From Swiss-Prot:
NCBIfam families: nqrC, PRK05346.2-2. Its cofactor is FMN. InterPro entries: FMN-bd, NqrC. It is a single-pass membrane protein. The lineage of its organism: Bacteria, Pseudomonadati, Chlamydiota, Chlamydiia, Chlamydiales. NQR complex catalyzes the reduction of ubiquinone-1 to ubiquinol by two successive reactions, coupled with the transport of Na(+) ions from the cytoplasm to the periplasm. NqrA to NqrE are probably involved in the second step, the conversion of ubisemiquinone to ubiquinol. The chain crosses the membrane at residues 14-34. The keyword Protein biosynthesis does not apply. GO terms for biological process: sodium ion transport. Keywords: Cell inner membrane, Cell membrane, Flavoprotein, FMN, Ion transport, Membrane, NAD, Phosphoprotein, Sodium, Sodium transport, Translocase, Transmembrane, Transmembrane helix, Transport, Ubiquinone. This is Na(+)-translocating NADH-quinone reductase subunit C. Belongs to the NqrC family.
Length: 319
């Protein structure tokens, strides 16, 4: 009975080194190929998540990822009509929005714009700036530190508004239904990035959302919890005076996440309108969120004031 002769070279040092090198090379090439194939999908998923968070902050989406529309004094489930390209009140339960439908809505009703510190608005085309490159360049930093400030507007749910270019919107800002400002700062463990959506009066909060944060689960990470985010709806980013009036030019601007309950601390005073209940055990994260709102919103003051004045003129004109 014959037996296979041993292969002495298998125990040689050079063979072991060669084998390890070949295995490492194969693994490196394999992982690089997988990354190259999956990178576009990961990027699209990240864009979808940011868009979803933005529209959730603006109350276009509810917290379950379904369209909603403000009709007859309340938010009602809605669907995206692919023929008219408008949102319509749902006859039955609204479906969860898919990536393709979200893209269609965003292209039709969301416009990225620029503003200077004086509140003057510009389109990216007017400034000869590529919007994709601008966002990619600054998205891991602070948009509020740039000479030209990025913001988004949500347009009215009409065919006329949908057909308007960014330049058209600037000429006719009355079609704007919401203003979305990028928010960035630092939590306990690292950077936090999100959005704050404001009504077209430049003051009343629609909502907030965070698309990137690494806070402690169950504690600071609750800034991304819908139950905590719901309390932002209806808050005011310009602090009202005790008499109930607002001096937009001089009053503090921002939202303060306090320690404890707003009701216990401020009751029904104007301060309560610009304050948010804190998160137990996450004081440092809450302080970081407060600072993020203050720093991110400050350069946009004149832009927000311009919308407040426009809203007041429209309100007076409709009387």
């Amino acid at each position: 009975m014959s037996s296979e002769k041993p292969k002495p070279h298998l125990n040689k040092t050079w063979y072991v080194i060669l084998f390890i090198f070949a295995l490492s090379l194969f693994s490196s090439v394999f992982l690089s190929t997988v990354y190259y194939i999956l990178a576009p999908f990961e990027e699209r998923a990240a864009i979808f998540d940011r868009d979803q968070q933005m529209l959730t902050a603006a109350h276009v989406l509810d917290f379950s990822g379904k369209f909603q529309i403000y009709e007859e004094g309340s938010w009602q489930p809605a669907v995206y009509d692919k023929k008219s390209h408008l949102l319509k009140v749902a006859d039955q339960h609204a479906p969860v929005v898919t990536s393709s439908v979200l893209d269609a809505y965003t292209q039709g009703f969301v416009r990225p714009l620029l503003a200077d510190k004086l509140g003057q608005m510009f389109s990216f085309e007017e400034k000869n700036i590529n919007v994709t490159e601008f966002i990619e360049k600054h998205q891991n930093g602070h948009f509020y530190q740039q000479p030209l400030l990025l913001f988004y507007v949500i347009l009215a749910n009409t065919e006329q508004a949908r057909a308007m270019s960014a330049a058209d919107v600037i000429k006719n800002p009355s079609v704007v239904r919401a203003i979305i400002i990028p928010i960035s700062g630092f939590g306990l463990w690292g950077p936090i990035y999100g959005y704050l959506a404001v009504e077209n009066n430049g003051d009343t909060v629609l909502g907030t959302a965070w698309y990137q944060q690494a806070e402690t689960p169950g504690l600071g990470a609750n800034i991304a919890n819908p139950q905590w985010q719901k309390q932002f709806y209806g808050k005011k980013i310009f602090l009202q005076a005790a008499a109930g009036n607002t001096d937009f030019a001089t009053t503090p601007l921002g939202l303060e996440v306090i320690k404890g309950s707003v009701q216990s601390a401020f009751g029904t005073t104007p301060k309560a309108l610009s304050s948010i209940d804190g998160i137990s055990g996450a004081t440092l994260t809450c302080n970081g969120v407060t600072e993020a709102y203050a720093q991110s919103l400050a350069p946009y003051r004149n832009l927000l004031i311009s919308f407040a004045k426009l809203n007041q003129r429209d309100h007076n004109g409709s009387k």
